[in-house]
A protein has these predicted regions:
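PLP-dependent class I/II
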Residues: 1-185
Length: 185
């Protein structure tokens, strides 16, 4: 991908309309593994601030990065418009447990709590205990294993002549199939 799956002011602007209420920011990205650069984050920040949009930051792969990573939470002047979403399943290998949390300004949390009370009764106790224990776990050995696997698969794809962006996070590789006359449809 020419832009390395980064967000540019131009490609973001063409997708924002008068009906837009929020931007969903997924970094590291699923399925590309791209980690957004400070320039990409700045582009989102400028548009969100100018258009008074919420930014939902899907950070479920934030602990699974292979280099520099910056959280969107650094933009404190729009703090009331930022919702950080985190999961236990990806960083702690608890796939299928469907347990997570979010961080947001108090008025946002109060509104989300109302919604939550009508959609979820409670998390089962063993999930709560497992997630609490996971917070004491250091995921860096798992991240190093993912890095080795990423490097191996990436290297093999490149050796086979595939065009693929080396993922900066998560555990996905997203090869291009365009040169084979195929598209994603």
């Amino acid at each position: 991908c020419a832009d390395h799956f980064q967000i540019t002011p131009q490609n973001l602007a063409q997708h924002i309309t008068a009906k837009s209420k929020a931007i969903l920011l997924n970094s590291p990205n699923n399925p590309t593994g791209a980690v957004y650069t400070p320039e990409s984050l700045d582009a989102v920040y400028q548009v969100a601030k100018e258009k008074n949009l919420f930014v939902l930051c899907d950070n479920v792969y934030a602990q699974l990065v292979y280099g520099p990573y910056q959280s969107f939470s650094r933009y404190q002047d729009i703090r009331e418009k930022i919702i950080l979403i985190q999961s236990f399943s990806k960083p702690y290998a608890m796939t299928g447990w469907r347990m997570g949390y979010l961080c947001a300004d108090r008025p946002v949390i109060e509104q989300l709590a109302k919604l939550h009370s009508y959609t979820v009764v409670s998390a089962v106790s063993f999930l709560q205990k497992g997630c609490a224990a996971a917070l004491d776990y250091d995921p860096s050995p798992m991240v190093e294993t993912y890095r080795r696997r990423r490097d191996y698969v990436y290297g093999r794809l490149v050796e086979m002549g595939m065009e693929v962006q080396k993922p900066q996070g998560a555990f996905y590789l997203f090869p291009s199939i365009q040169k084979y006359g195929m598209d994603s449809e």
